[in-house]
């Protein structure tokens, strides 16, 4: 006779089920509140608040086709652009550097064939199998979109694979054609023999809310161009290469970003850093391509569409203090003070739900009060020295200036924020990666497991009335990582828990902020020692 499960086991299972149901219900209630808020901000053209909410809470998937164009329209890297050049390259000859120009020398037919090969990898098309008319039309639309970009920017940027994969990633959230909601279903997710799916069927939204959305003023190609300007942004090229390896608050070039990533990775996760660098994940050009997708292409091809969408929410919502724009974009000659209103227009209740301690996630004690680019604070080293001066224990000679009702601006350049998000993802998967063989590590780096399962489930179910327990909540809720201190508590920084538990992208995002503060404090200690 089979044994019956103990009553205590059944009770525990019921408690977990009720806990999961309650947690999902609360999340779905908040998601509905977010949808209403975003629609309100869109109709008021309150793009500053829109950016603040997007980078801290994420954009509901249903609304990305409406929200992303507005975020891009007012993005500083779109208004004052400068992108990584693959036509201008420094050549070092016997310690003498020279900037050389390598224009595109491939024919349009050759480039078109390269695009076709990249598209076939996404759609899993084999040469021996006829391509459906639907896929052929989509491929043509995407190629034309990239061609439009290249015709405009070809002196700076010639074709590389990332351009087509950015277009594919955008098409997973924004329709290729105006006035419909058909988006790409994602790799390996063809839907009813189609590579397209209706966004509002996958992520439902009531008609009365949908009808309130303003018409977008950009077509897909215009959104794509602006997105590339953000993802491929780089500091202006000088006549001589920048030998500095210190680029944190400011943006660095691709090589400097890679150096920063490995520096933070090595300090934060030394036990994991060693096997990953030793076991071949960085050896050989093919094995190291994951770095290109992670850093330059901001998650294209390697992150699931849900996680990549959330990462792009962060990048597109980046907004620094208007008077400090030139600190981050040194080449800029435009004024942003009339574009970005300083006053916070969100209600206090909503603001404290989004910014729980009145900061962006990447905050640091006293950094908000500094006027970067002014008063001798022109380089990252200047800022670090000033932070050290202000944060000495027992230094009562300074009080942090705060302005009431001011938007908490972004303090770290968005591409550096992305690097800390990646380190948080590695930390979340540390135990698993330590047990992996070399081939498994390489597979992980090229196909990062889905993080946003809980978020995705609740955005899909938030307007349903049926059971909301969900299959994505089998684990207990993560322990709170402590309340983040206000900027007046000098250097009393919470580094977060180390339980490797993440139930949503928000957990990873918060952990990334904790890693940033802990690492910045270590940098300051090294500065003091030097």
UniProtKB/Swiss-Prot annotation:
Q: Where is the composition biased (Polar residues)?
A: 479-490
Gene3D superfamilies, A to Z: Ypt/Rab-GAP domain of gyp1p, domain 3
Query: Origin, by domain of life?
Result: Eukaryota
Q: Where is the Rab-GAP TBC domain?
A: 58-319
- Which is one Gene Ontology cellular component term of this protein? cytoplasm
Which InterPro entries does UniProt cross-reference here?
A: Rab-GAP-TBC_dom (IPR000195), Rab-GAP_TBC_sf (IPR035969)
Q: What is its main location?
A: cytoplasm
Region: Disordered; residue ranges are 1-24, 467-491
Q: Where in the cell is it found?
A: Cytoplasm
Q: Which residues form the signal peptide?
A: none
Q: Name one Pfam family in it.
A: RabGAP-TBC
Instruction: Name the UniProt key words of this record, in alphabetical order.
Output: Cytoplasm
What is stated as this protein's family in its record?
A: Belongs to the OCA5 family.
What's the protein here called?
Oxidant-induced cell-cycle arrest protein 5
Q: From what organism does this protein derive?
A: Kluyveromyces lactis (strain ATCC 8585 / CBS 2359 / DSM 70799 / NBRC 1267 / NRRL Y-1140 / WM37) (Yeast)
